[in-house]
Amino acid sequence: MNTINKKEIEKFSKIAAEWWNPNGKFKPLHKFNPIRIKYIKDNIIKKFNLNSSNKPLKTINILDIGCGGGLLSEPMSRLGASVVGIDASKKNIEVAKFHAKKNKLKINYICASPEILKIQKKFDVILGMEIVEHVEDINFFIKKSSELLKKNGLMFIATLNKTLKSYVFAIVGAEYILR
């Protein structure tokens, strides 16, 4: 079994160069990211009883599954976290590595999925943001992802609801309301 949906990987590989274009194909994520980052940061601080200093996540190890070009990995790194970002698209990983290096960030990007990740540690926090709608087997994805989480760790999973109403709200919300 695996979680990789080859059609989704091909689709995202074709648009990998767009990740850091705030007006490109990932514009809704760029608009929504500040809200996501604050929510994640605040919940990590609360869960692990951290000080909200300049680098509040400096003691936290994060695994960002389906990291794409690093839109969430980079802010988590800037907040002090030690970040490993994984994505099944080699092109996404190349974009993420290039952008992190350009911004002098130390993020370990690996072309992998949760079931094939060869890493000997477990993580305080796992991020699976806007990824489950792109995997082959959601239950297997959740199982394999949670095996990488430390006991009493924190896992964030988010996806768009697959209804017309939620799609319209997400697009309209990201495009107009979050300006």
Question: What are the language-model segments listed below?
Answer:
Residues 1-26:
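N-terminal, positively charged/glycine-rich alpha-helical extensions of SAM-dependent methyltransferases
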Residues 4, 32, 36, 137:
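Soluble or luminal CAZymes and related metallo-dependent hydrolases
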Residues 22-47:
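Conserved SAM-binding loop and adjacent beta-strand
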Residues 26-29, 103, 109, 177-178:
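A C-terminal cap/extension of S-adenosyl-L-methionine-dependent methyltransferases
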Residues 47, 51-167:
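Conserved SAM-binding loop
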Residues 164-179:
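Short, glycine-/aromatic-enriched active-site segment of Class I SAM-dependent methyltransferases
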